[in-house]
Amino acid sequence: GETPALNAFPPSTVRAIAEVAERTGPGAQGQGDITAIFSVLVAGSDMEEPVADMVRGVLDGHIILSREISERGRYPAIDVLRSLSRCLPDAAKPDENRIIKDYRRTIALYEEIAPMLRANLYERGHDAAGDRSIERFPQLDNFVSEPNTGHIPQAFQHLQGLLDPVEAAEKT
């Protein structure tokens, strides 16, 4: 019996989580690989809860599902801004990374403006980037829930078209 420490978790919890995560990945020569998807359910969607925080620190990436997004009726209810892949920048092409960055920036700006929109306090015409995020958000939000086409280049081309229709038209 260990003395409880972090929110009643014993100190060995961090080590145990790291050991489980370290067992996945490439095995020794001739032993095969282990691919794993870990699922962590947090109480009250508190992502700062110790186990969720530890897992985020150990793994290469995480997909955060949002109760608020699911209540809006969008599935999968992936919170794109809070989800992360540390490997993605190296796995994606430079153009794809630029599109991803623009997508995340546009969604983040919309989420920043959304309370002002709901309170009828936002005035269009004063901030071009804000106006663009308001105009593009519905299509960008729907993009996440569209059926997978199975072709990554076409998905990025479609996303680029949603973000900047003029630039996308010039490329075709």
Model-found features: residue ranges?
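P-loop NTPase catalytic core
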Residues: 1-172
